[in-house]
């Protein structure tokens, strides 16, 4: 004996027992109800149910479902900033605009492109999607970001394991023009280590020309925010000290490119260097 739900007037339903062949619940329930259920699934499950049949695939392929799952599972957005530091840290942000502007389709497309270029890498685990909130902690800067980092690295006066004094003096109070989403690689690009900055710029430019359109060398504040966000949310030290890894940034201080990384248990390093080494490569970042 099986239970079947038949839709009647409005949003009310009646139930009846019968001995006939079981019906697919997708064919019985209204699309709105199925989509509500599917909205609680993770990315892996959404991908799996697309293979059940055409009806399931039609509903599971709704862009809003993937957007919700990516926001919840992949993105480090205002909700995660608030979870880590309290709601006041993003109290002046527009959360509706934040979600509507989430580049979920671009994230999926770039993951596929990244996989085609670097087949040895897991694409989903190679890109981080981070919200750079202009008003974060009163205004996103290297200094205010460091104040947040002190919650995790209390032994540091700045929130960083080390940040060069001239960087604080020249860039410490600089912010961003607007709140925005960015995609950044979780590691330096293959083949970018121990190269001059000019060579690293060309590596990123060639990548952008081939497939990953609009990717560029990251700036110091962007790099530090993205790298620290992954630690705040998941306790993961990207661009770490094992093996020691830095990304070069666009910014110059005292004539030298800033590098960010060497993320040790004591915190992140933001320094500047005038030489090429195997531990200095370059990441790639895309703004939205």
Mark where each language-model region is.
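Skp1-binding F-box subdomain of Cullin-RING ligase substrate receptors
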Residues: 4-74
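A binding-site-centric feature that preferentially detects glycan-recognition modules on secreted/surface proteins
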Residues: 71-216, 221-288
């Amino acid at each position: 004996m099986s239970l079947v739900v038949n839709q009647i007037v409005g949003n009310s339903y009646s139930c009846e027992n019968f001995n006939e062949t079981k019906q697919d619940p997708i064919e019985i329930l209204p699309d709105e109800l199925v989509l509500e259920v599917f909205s609680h699934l993770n990315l892996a499950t959404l991908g799996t149910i697309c293979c059940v049949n055409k009806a399931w695939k039609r509903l599971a392929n709704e862009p809003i479902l993937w957007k919700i799952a990516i926001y919840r599972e992949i993105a480090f957005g205002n909700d995660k900033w608030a979870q880590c530091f309290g709601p006041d840290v993003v109290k002046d942000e527009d959360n509706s605009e934040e979600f509507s502007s989430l580049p979920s389709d671009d994230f999926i497309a770039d993951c596929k492109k990244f996989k085609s270029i670097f087949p040895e890498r897991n694409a989903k685990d190679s890109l981080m999607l981070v919200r750079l909130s202009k008003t974060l902690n009163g205004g996103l800067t290297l200094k205010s970001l460091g104040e947040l980092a002190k919650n995790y690295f209390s032994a540091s006066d700045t929130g960083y394991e080390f940040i060069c004094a001239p960087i604080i003096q020249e860039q410490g109070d600089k912010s961003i023009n607007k709140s925005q989403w960015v995609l950044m690689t979780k590691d330096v690009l293959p083949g970018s280590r121990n190269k001059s900055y000019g060579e690293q710029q060309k590596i990123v430019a060639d990548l952008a020309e081939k497939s990953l359109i609009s990717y560029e060398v990251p700036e110091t504040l962007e790099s530090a925010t993205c790298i620290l966000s992954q630690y705040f949310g998941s306790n993961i030290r990207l661009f770490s000290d094992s093996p020691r890894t830095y990304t070069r940034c666009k910014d110059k201080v005292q004539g030298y490119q800033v590098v960010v990384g060497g993320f040790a248990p004591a915190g992140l390093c933001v320094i500047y260097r005038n030489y090429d080494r195997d531990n200095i490569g370059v990441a790639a970042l895309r703004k939205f």
